[in-house]
Amino acid sequence: MVKYFAGDWTVQELAAIEQELERQGVQYTIDGEELLVHDDHQERRVDMIVESITET
């Protein structure tokens, strides 16, 4: 499992990240201020998604 701190993301950023994760079939959970990605092998893909959405 890979953890991302989502507390600094806006509501819009989090919604966009969730939408993209769902579109790509990445299994995840939101737990408080953490985004938990269930498959360690998806880490690089999720990194790219998060970076592309939060750096705009």
Model regions: which residues?
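Short glycine-/aliphatic-rich beta-strand segments at the starts of folded cytosolic domains
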Residues: 1-7
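Short amphipathic alpha-helix segments
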Residues: 8-24
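Residues that cap or initiate secondary-structure elements
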Residues: 9-10, 41-43
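Short, well-structured beta-strand/strand-turn elements
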Residues: 26-33
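A generic structural motif
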Residues: 33-40
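Charge-rich, low-aromatic oligomerization/scaffolding segments with amphipathic character
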Residues: 42-56
